[in-house]
């Protein structure tokens, strides 16, 4: 299996996909901020940082914010237009408020986004480390956004570069070519005005297609990744159709595009579909982390990793996330990969 995906990209999965969300502030915001609202009481504990964390592309992601009152804000390009969603949890009740043409769509998707379609009870730990990690994180459920491009484009940017480089490119391109997020934005909670609150909705497929070559260069995106994104947005409708497929078939649809391989397609369906079995192959560090955690083998490759995860068939992505969240990772043996910036050339 490993040979199929070599050479492995110099990029690693976000460590567990956990974002720290401040504790819920006691202040009563029952009046809202003028958006459409929805309340939902799931019969399980919701951990916004664990569930929504994989959707954040770096601490300065213009499409994702957390605020001191314990809320998570997201700006998305939905099938019906741009939308902003604020999500918080109070006494076990999820409170959603949304703005923009995509507001109703985002509120309708809210339960799925917070893991309603996930089935963590189907997961049976086979290793003590995994069992302990699961016990310590009862709020871990897999998000299902129902959106493909918002995960596909940043995943392409993350191919074969450091996360810092990819996050910078995403941040620069979304801020320059996206649109301000609808609604008051996170600043309104702190009494600061300004539409969108500094958040942006990612560009539409048409706008991505019109970005000049020198702007990709300035953002540090090489021609190979830029060309892949251009190919993807040319068939944007076909890409989004994959939401209606089961995860394996969706990956096949995405991989029809030249430049989108198993690593990228897995990173997408983990988010768009909540795919519990879509383990990331071709990652620089994940095989060594899984190998070290489960067998003490820090030099494991994809084939070894998949063999170790075989007892978790059907739930391999969840197992990998729990391993990442356990914190049991091998000590670094070499300096971090230096950040490159082709924009300076």
PLM segments and residue spans:
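HhH-family (HhH-GPD) DNA N-glycosylase catalytic core used in base-excision repair
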Residues: 2-345
